Swiss-Prot record:
Family matches, as Gene3D superfamilies: Metalloproteases ('zincins'), catalytic domain
Source taxon at top rank: Bacteria
Species assigned in the record: Pseudomonas syringae pv. tomato (strain ATCC BAA-871 / DC3000)
PROSITE patterns per record: UPF0054
One Gene Ontology MF term: zinc ion binding
Signal peptide residue numbers: none
EC number: 3.1.-.-
Key words of the record: Cytoplasm, Endonuclease, Hydrolase, Metal-binding, Nuclease, Ribosome biogenesis, rRNA processing, Zinc
Locations listed in the record: Cytoplasm
InterPro entries with a match to the protein in the record: MetalPrtase_cat_dom_sf_prd (IPR023091), YbeY (IPR002036), YbeY_CS (IPR020549)
Listed cofactors: Zn(2+)
Cysteines joined through disulfide linkages: none
Identification of the protein by name: Endoribonuclease YbeY
Family from the record: Belongs to the endoribonuclease YbeY family.
Length: 166
């Protein structure tokens, strides 16, 4: 069972809770245990502040992943962590990349969920593994390959703040 806490702190239109639940369940499908996570939808001001605080980057990014650092046996429901998604950035990226809003949102949510499960894209091998899983999950939902038109290694990855900052 997925316990999802959707916090809306942005006035920019975003998908509904049912879509987020579907995308999270797909991204967390390999996890058999119950899971709890929070998705906070923010505007660019809050997105920039969080990215600056945790990553020392002075711009709003699409998705920040904050994995929980609490042993599962200390909680009734295993807390995976939090995703902070900057709504205007995700919507703008979809338009700039010629992707449907729904497909790009699904990609960002699944990408963030995979970070909460421990996947990363720091080196090429990890990135290839993570991207392959994203492609598979998105294809099962009927969405196109999010990396099909990429000619460089610069993908719209979400960012996971280092645990050194927690």
């Amino acid at each position: 069972m997925l316990e999802l806490d959707l916090q809306i702190a942005s006035e920019t239109p975003a998908p509904d809770e049912a879509r987020f639940r579907l995308w999270c369940e797909m991204g967390l499908r390999q996890r058999s245990a119950d899971s709890e996570l929070t998705i906070r939808l923010v505007d660019e001001t809050e997105g920039r502040e969080l990215n600056h605080t945790w990553r020392h980057k002075n711009y709003a990014t699409n998705v920040l992943s904050f994995p929980a650092d609490v042993p599962d046996d200390m909680l009734d429901i295993p807390l995976l962590g939090d995703l902070v998604i900057c709504v205007p950035v995700v919507n703008r990226e979809a338009a700039e990349q010629g992707k449907s809003i729904d497909a790009h949102w699904a990609h960002m949510v699944i990408h963030g969920c995979l970070h909460l499960l421990g996947y990363d894209h720091i080196d090429d091998e990890e990135a290839e593994e993570m991207e392959a899983l994203e492609r598979t999950l998105l294809e099962e939902l009927g969405y196109p390959d999010p990396y099909a038109d990429d000619e460089s290694a610069d993908h719209p990855h979400s960012d996971t703040p280092s645990k050194d900052h927690e």
